[in-house]
Amino acid sequence: MRHGKICAETYYAPYNKDSLHRMFSITKSFVSMAIGCLAEEGKLKLDDKIVDYFPEKQPESGTYKYTAMLTIRDMLKMKTCHTKTTYKNPGVTDWVGSFFTTKPTHVPGTVFSYDTSSTHVLGALVEKLSGMTILDYLRSKGLDELGFSKDAHILTDPQGIEMGGSGMCASSRDILLMMMLIKGDGALNGRQYFPKDYVKAAKSLQSDTYGKQGTFEEMQGYGYQIWLTRNGGYVLFGMGGQLALYVPDKDIFMITTADAQGRQGGVQLIYDAFWDEIYSAIDSDSLPENKKAHDELIKYCESRTVMNITGSSTSSLECDITDKIYICDENACGVKSIQLNIDKTTHTGHLSIKNNDGIQVIDFGMCTNEYGIFPGYDLEYAASAAWRMEDYLLIKIQIIDSAVGNLYIGLSFKDSYLTVMMRKTVEDLFNEYDGIFSGRTM
């Protein structure tokens, strides 16, 4: 989007402009705006101590000294007292409580250390002080009036509290709307929705990240739950390539949803493509009309689909292995047996995996996607398979639901033996689909 007009827009089927996508840490920026609104209402002050709002969550032995020093402003800056997300510790069910019962490592308000549990606590604070969920509170502040998706929502933790650090499911246009509000210092269409001074501070440098973060784009600094970028820009950033980027000097927005999990440097590639191919090519002059180029762009945008794996759709081994049951060695994945079926007529197949929960059947297409609901998880998926080598079939399963990620299941056949390679890139789920083991046909 540039100068208030969408220049190009494309979605990869089955996604479309109304599809909800997991936005991961972009949720944090929404929590930040809600905190700013609560401060404007006088329901909190940024320099308040967070422990004062959660006395019921403090350890029985007493509040930790460094935790007691922590302010809401420190949390917004990601300068907390923890070095990692506390609710990911083993056995935790009370996510908010874990933030206060986990022993802190350092004085807060000093150094940047990315901590999703901190923002989760801020989200819980929004619910506590507003009496509403995070999104409902922001809807009351203007998101509904501006056309934010009615079915957008935030997933909840085991206690039923919205996951303020990572749980939002919304459309690309929803994220563009929030970014337009942030660009306008909280105002849009001549009306002030969020507090101006707060929004200006939120997109300004509050924390240095240069020595802490691992990718170049994340080394440019941090505001109040908003990242800074090269060339004076700022971005709402969610894991795997969820980006809402705005660069003032070119007045350009870029919104992306993606799944770069499991691809080292994948998100940086998106940034680099934008800087190298789009940002650097923009100048103040309008381009001359070019109908051919325009039509080619439209055709390209309308033809996108989620990728499928490539390779050969057939193998000389198929007749020997189809429908045979392979009994698996004892393994960490809990898989007891595997059966593969490939239909040469329909170019589809299914994999039957017997584990501790019964038989899980995964349908797939050969070099094309088949869609279904993943057994045991009730999540939509797209799956394709290809013979990457004559004796090696690889199945790629894309989770395209409130969870986002990939599962890879590789089947290597050698005489009467089958070796299975499973790898998952879905956060916190599908742990039983990660490992290597072998089996033998009956």
Task: Give the ranges of each region predicted by the language model.
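Active-site helix/loop module of the DD-peptidase/beta-lactamase fold
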Residues: 22, 41-80, 101, 130-166, ...
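Active-site-proximal binding-pocket segments
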Residues: 144-203
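Active-site SXXK
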Residues: 4, 21-47, 75, 122-126, ...
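Active-site Gly/Thr loop motif
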Residues: 152, 199-257
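Structured C-terminal helix/loop/strand segments within mature extracytoplasmic catalytic/sensor domains
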Residues: 238-309
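Active-site-proximal alpha-helical segments within enzyme catalytic domains
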Residues: 118-125, 164-187, 242-259, 275
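Peripheral terminal and inter-domain segments
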Residues: 291-442
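A short, well-structured edge-of-sheet supersecondary motif
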Residues: 1-15, 251-254
